[in-house]
């Protein structure tokens, strides 16, 4: 596992970019901690590249609406990647936009080997992050494959971490997990649904990769009670396509817990 940490001022990005059409801002005391967790194996790496290409948009929207937001990033492959790239690569929660940008630029594609991936390690590493007291806490898990120990033996969890145990631990810390499935594998759907249910999060199926960044923003806005405002902004900018609208309906219909 490779880990990077740090903290400066994410809000300096919004000051630099301006943005008169920024969404409504939450109370200055409201803190939001969110981690973006990505499968970087094979074609899944394209999703991280899409976030990389739109990182200015993502960071601007979040830090303008939630001045005390911190973001972390957890990239994961599989155990076979340990000798060539990484099993997990971690950026701790930070408000330093440049650090986030540099981290995502440096994350490499992994191979993955078999179908299950080291989701359990991504959950474990997320448990180790510096979550702040009194913050709204969310993890967004983006992937197309289940963790080890679902369709293979628990012995395949080479570092000894169990996805269900790690999920329950995250839930006890008040961290909601929003699981975003890419593709339609039934085993992935089943376990992603369970992960979200355990933590009072939401399971979502992503039909179009181009919707991912606005979905990430929408999840953050939901956490601080600004989802309706952000949806209206998308409508005003003619950016709310049918698949994106479907995702926002799923977010909006789920009661806050």
Mark where each language-model region is.
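Divalent cation-coordinating acidic motifs and surrounding scaffolds
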Residues: 2-257
């Amino acid at each position: 596992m490779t880990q990077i940490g740090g903290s400066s001022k994410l809000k300096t990005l919004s000051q630099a970019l301006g943005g008169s059409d920024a969404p409504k801002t939450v109370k200055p005391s409201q803190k939001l901690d969110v981690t973006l967790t990505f499968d970087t194996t094979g074609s899944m790496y394209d999703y991280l590249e899409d976030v990389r290409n739109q990182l200015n948009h993502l960071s601007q929207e979040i830090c303008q609406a939630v001045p005390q937001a911190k973001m972390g990033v957890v990239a994961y492959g599989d155990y076979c990647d340990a000798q060539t790239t990484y099993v997990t690569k971690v950026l701790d929660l930070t408000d330093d936009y440049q650090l986030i940008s540099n981290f995502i630029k440096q994350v490499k594609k992994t191979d993955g080997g078999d179908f299950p991936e080291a989701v359990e390690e991504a959950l474990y590493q997320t448990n180790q992050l510096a979550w702040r007291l009194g913050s709204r806490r969310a993890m967004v898990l983006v992937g197309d494959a289940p963790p080890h120990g679902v369709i293979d033996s628990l012995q395949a969890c080479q570092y000894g971490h169990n996805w269900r145990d790690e999920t329950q631990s995250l839930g006890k810390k008040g961290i909601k997990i929003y699981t975003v499935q890419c593709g339609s594998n039934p085993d992935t759907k089943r376990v992603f649904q369970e992960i979200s249910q355990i933590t009072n999060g939401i399971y979502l199926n992503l039909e179009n990769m181009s919707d991912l960044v606005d979905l990430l923003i929408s999840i953050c806005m939901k956490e601080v009670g600004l989802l309706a405002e952000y949806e209206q902004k998308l409508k005003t900018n003619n950016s709310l396509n049918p698949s994106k609208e479907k995702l926002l309906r799923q977010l909006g219909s789920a009661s806050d817990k």
